Amino acid sequence: DVCPNKSRACFTFCLDNAGRGRFDHVKLARLVKTKRYRLDPAKFTREVSQELARKVKWWSSNRPAWQLVLRADGTSDIGIGRRICHDHPSVQFMDYTKHLQVIRRDCKIPYGSNYHLTFSWSGENEQECREALDLGYNVAAPFLPNTKSGAWHPPEFMGYPVISGENDDLRFL
């Protein structure tokens, strides 16, 4: 399991089944990558870093004005981005986690100036979400549209303003 803090509530809204993630070929590719990671985490991480280095080279040649952004843990919580962000200072890393200890550690000793963390709501971790918010981190939480107003999200959640992630989730900006 690459997302050990998942809950029944968050499974309903998981990115694993959203958009392209719901297609069999995408699920199979993720499964193959997970198996490769489990067999040799160090080798897999090295290969991801090498692939990213090739992408950085291509982007710097073909799209020099664009910022390359990597969300390594979109559907997992294994922390590859945390391990390779220092090797790729020109890349902006963004990750999601349900591990409060990862947030606490980043708060004390940041993983990198090019690494941004967002804490994920699971439906069962309100206390942890409050702590992450109080520490200055964003919390990602899914909302169903209000059947009366049609609004996709409330104006506030846990006393903090809600910013819609419908257009983008570039919280580091």
Regions found by a protein language model. Give the residues of each.
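Class I S-adenosyl-L-methionine
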Residues: D1-L173
